[in-house]
Regions:
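Short, basic/hydrophobic alpha-helical segments
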Residues: 192-211
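Hydrophobic "anchor" residues on beta-strands that sit immediately upstream
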Residues: 131, 211-212
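Dynamic "connector" segments at or just before major functional cores
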Residues: 1-152, 162, 169-188, 195-196
């Protein structure tokens, strides 16, 4: 008697495209290299958890942790086939994602990670780093101002000094517009002191001077 086949139905959407692009960028390996875990870590590596989590954010347009585990549970075959990994829903519980965030919140390691990512991207895609554009902007919001928080009152480029804002400094590779460095700081900060740290990080990551 012939066995009855098992039919699995999942929404694929843009997940394979996103994950393939992230693998070409070397994200899983870069995450694992620059944000190592201890011996008690089991299951999917931090690099793959982070990469699949990013694909969820981009595909769903939602950064909230609470939706990640059920999203993964409905796409186990798609995620496992695309990544070649043994993916389970327990790799994406709130506790596991909080553990990932704690390890990723390390400024010095982020600098090394960004440097490795930019060098890999420029090399693999044969980009020509001839000119880098550095500039800042601000984003206003109906947010509550708190001591030490990101949203603060400052000089408003949007002509809304009554609203708190957050400030973003970014360096991008011209003319492609690929981000090379991004700093998010509180809204009362002046622009001038933000340029030099951003420029120095770009120079370190691409290994060249005279681009700015």
């Amino acid at each position: 008697m012939n066995a009855i086949p098992t039919i699995i139905t999942e929404r694929v959407d843009d997940i394979p495209l996103l994950l393939e692009q992230m693998q070409r960028m070397g994200l899983p390996t870069l995450f694992d290299t620059h944000f190592p875990t201890h011996g008690n870590w089991t299951g999917l590596s931090l690099g793959w958890v982070s990469t699949i989590w990013l694909s969820s954010m981009l595909s769903q347009g939602d950064h909230r942790m609470v939706h990640v585990e059920p999203w993964v549970a409905k796409r186990l075959w798609t995620l496992g086939t695309t990544t070649g990994q043994m993916v389970t829903r327990v790799d994406f519980t709130d506790d596991r994602l909080e553990s990932v965030l704690r390890r990723l919140s390390h400024d010095e390691r982020w600098g090394a990670f960004a440097s490795g990512l930019h060098q890999h991207t420029v090399r693999v895609y044969a980009l020509s780093p001839e000119r880098v554009h550095v500039d800042s902007t601000s984003a206003k919001a109906y947010a509550t101002v708190s001591d030490g928080g990101l949203f603060q009152f400052g000089h408003s480029k949007d002509y809304r000094p009554d609203l708190p804002q957050v400030k973003v400094m970014q360096a991008v590779l011209d003319p492609l517009g690929m981000p090379l460095a991004t700093d998010v700081v509180s809204g009362e900060r002046a622009d001038d002191p933000l340029y030099r740290p951003c420029i120095e990080r770009v120079q370190a990551s691409v290994g060249r001077h005279g681009l700015l």
